[in-house]
Amino acid sequence: MIKFLSALILLLVTTAAQAERIRDLTSVQGVRQNSLIGYGLVVGLDGTGDQTTQTPFTTQTLNNMLSQLGITVPTGTNMQLKNVAAVMVTESLPPFGRQGQTIDVVVSSMGNAKSLRGGTLLMTPLKGVDSQVYALAQGNILVGGAGASAGGSSVQVNQLNGGRITNGAVIERELPSQFGVGNTLNLQLNDEDFSMAQQIADTINRVRGYGSATALDARTIQVRVPSGNSSQVRFLADIQNMQVNVTPQDAKVVINSRTGSVVMNREVTLDSCAVAQGNLSVTVNRQANVSQPDTPFGGGQTVVTPQTQIDLRQSGGSLQSVRSSASLNNVVRALNALGATPMDLMSILQSMQSAGCLRAKLEII
């Protein structure tokens, strides 16, 4: 019986504390992506390119490209192009990217092109913040949207002014890396948490020996590693696969003010409170009345007199009790019982936090 109770307690503890790998909670400082950007031309469009009269930079770019190919356009030539579009090309250089490796690129129209569907990106250099060329992009663009127009009517599905080229860029220059230099590496938590940082350090010390890891702050854990690239790779592979029990997160409610969506995690709780909500609507209706004389030759004038009607209505407003809720399901039931719309719910949650009834951080994005 004692063994059964011990096994049951151990099962409950492991269920409450969810174990995750260190690699899912942290990243290695210095091992990151680097943004690249470039400006280029897309050709081969089916009459959906830039209107060159409104986007002179497209014509200027085309003239510069033709001159580099040995073709001279006479001065003053007015090229009415419909199959060319000026675009911006963006992508990130992955960590440890090697010369000759291919990466995907995103192509976005910067002029007034109607669609990039069916277009081909001409060779475009991709530069970093240091103005050095790190990759060259070129290829056919895949656009996820579709559209058609005829007789003044048009239909469009998804976005047509942006697309993607799979393996569309080739890395030409490698970024220098400091990996393997020195005897320490820093692991950075995805979310700052003092207890989690200390727990990861303790886990590494239990396996690798005391003093192998030190929590510097709520986000950084410094780890002592052997020198040399290959030794550090093996050391990090072992550390990143270690299991750590994840402690409960901070209670948080995230509100998107643009879309009206409300998201909360499982740690959110409510205290008992009373909520009154109501809607106030004001309707203004203005009409123009025409007054004409009764007789055609009576000397009167035809006048227009405006007539305005204002209607103010207020609905709801009765107090409703919200019970104390200790779990996410109970919180959802309590808020749904109010019958509030998502937009009303945002104001209610803000007021509940001010009143001390919402036990969570409120973040508005």
Swiss-Prot record:
One of its GO terms (molecular function) is structural molecule activity. It is found in: Periplasm; Bacterial flagellum basal body. Residues 1-19 form the signal peptide. GO terms for biological process: bacterial-type flagellum-dependent cell motility. The keyword Signal applies. Keywords: Bacterial flagellum, Periplasm, Signal. GO terms for cellular component: bacterial-type flagellum basal body, distal rod, P ring; outer membrane-bounded periplasmic space. Pfam families: FlgI. InterPro entries: Flag_FlgI. NCBIfam families: PRK05303.1. Belongs to the FlgI family. The basal body constitutes a major portion of the flagellar organelle and consists of four rings (L,P,S, and M) mounted on a central rod. HAMAP family: FlgI (MF_00416). Assembles around the rod to form the L-ring and probably protects the motor/basal body from shearing forces during rotation. PANTHER family: FLAGELLAR P-RING PERIPLASMIC PROTEIN FLGI, FLAGELLAR P-RING PROTEIN. This is Flagellar P-ring protein. It comes from Shigella sonnei (strain Ss046). The gene is flgI.
